[in-house]
Amino acid sequence: MKTIQVNQMCSPRTGNPVANQFKIYTKKGVYFQSYSTIIAFKPHDFKGKLKLDESYWDYSRTTLKYLYDFININHRHRSKKNILKLIQDKQIILTNLN
C-alpha cells in the first residue's frame, strides 16, 4: 500500500497538468510543492490548521496562483491581503516547512 502519492496540479483555465506544481498526499495530510519547495500543508485532521512556509509562501505570482487553488480560495477573494488577514487571525500558521 502506498503511503505517499504525488499528483501534478492542473491549470484551472485549461485543465492540463502544469509543470513544477504538485500536491503530495500523505497519511498526515496534503502538501503543496512548487518546484522543489514545500509551500503549504493541510492536515487531514479538521482540528489542525493550514500551515504555510514562512519564507516561501508568497515567493512568486505563480506560487500564489497555485496556493490559492490548493487552499480553495475563490477568484473573488484571491489576494495576498486576504491571506495575511487569515495569518493575523491565526486561521493560518506560518512555520518552517523546508
Name each model feature, range by range.
Residues 1-98:
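Terminal leader/tail segments of proteins
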